[in-house]
Structures are given as structure tokens and as C-alpha cells.
Amino acid sequence: MFDWTKSCSYDEHQKKRFHTTARSRLKKLAAELDLTPGSYELRSNKAGIAVSGEVTLHHDSAYIQVGQFGMSSGHGILIRTCKGRKDYTGGANHFVALTMLDDIPALAAAVRAITGVGRDAPHSAVRRAA
């Protein structure tokens, strides 16, 4: 199992493994959410030597970003709504633990609960009323 807490700072090998593994898990997340091909993109930004950079799954309605930016809190996955793939600020930020990348069904449930995106997503009161 991948050690999400091992720092990528000044460790090119760890950073490469972090990006490769995170990208693979985000692909699995897209499949678990039953996202339509072409409705999302996966991006990787390795950034500078002192940081992990980030791997992003950007869907038309959801933005999920993985990085070591919340290590002191244990959080490293940002989930928020967005309005298209040109929206980089989106809705309110929600953070979950990096270790959720080891439990894709649980991560998918969190994404559905926060964004309403994906297979079997809960419908908002507004959608139910329509």
C-alpha cells in the first residue's frame, strides 16, 4: 500500500510515485462515479522541488485535487463543486484524508455527498422539487 504521508519534498522518486499512484486512483474514482468519458480531465502539476504538487480530476461539475497540502491535519484531498472545466475556484472547499485514496468506494461516496456528481448521487431538494 502506498504511504501517502511520506513527504515528496526534495524526493523526486517519491514525488513520481505520488503522482503516478494518485492519478491511477483518480482514474478509478472516475470509473466508480461512472463519469462519462470526455466529461472530465486528469491533470498533474509537479510544481517545485519543495512541494508535492497536485493531481486533479476536473469534471464539468466537480473539482477533486490531491496533494500533500494539509499534512498536519491529515487532509490532502480537496473536493468542491464547479461550473465547468474553466472554473478553478468553484464552490466551498471540503477536505478529506489522503488515505481515502485507498478506499475508492468511500471516496466516491464523499464526492457524491459534497458535489452531487456520480452514479447514485443524492438529489438535492431543488432537483426533487422539479
Regions found by a protein language model. Name each.
Residues 23, 27-30, 105-108, 112-115:
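Residue-level detector of alpha-helical secondary structure
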Residues 58-113:
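Intrinsically disordered, low-complexity regulatory segments enriched in Ser/Thr/Pro
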Residues 20, 24, 42-50, 78-92, ...:
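Charge-dense, helix-prone N-terminal extensions
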Residues 1-3, 117-130:
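Short intrinsically disordered terminal tails
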Residues 1-58, 125:
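Negatively charged, low-complexity tracts enriched in Asp/Glu with abundant Ser/Thr
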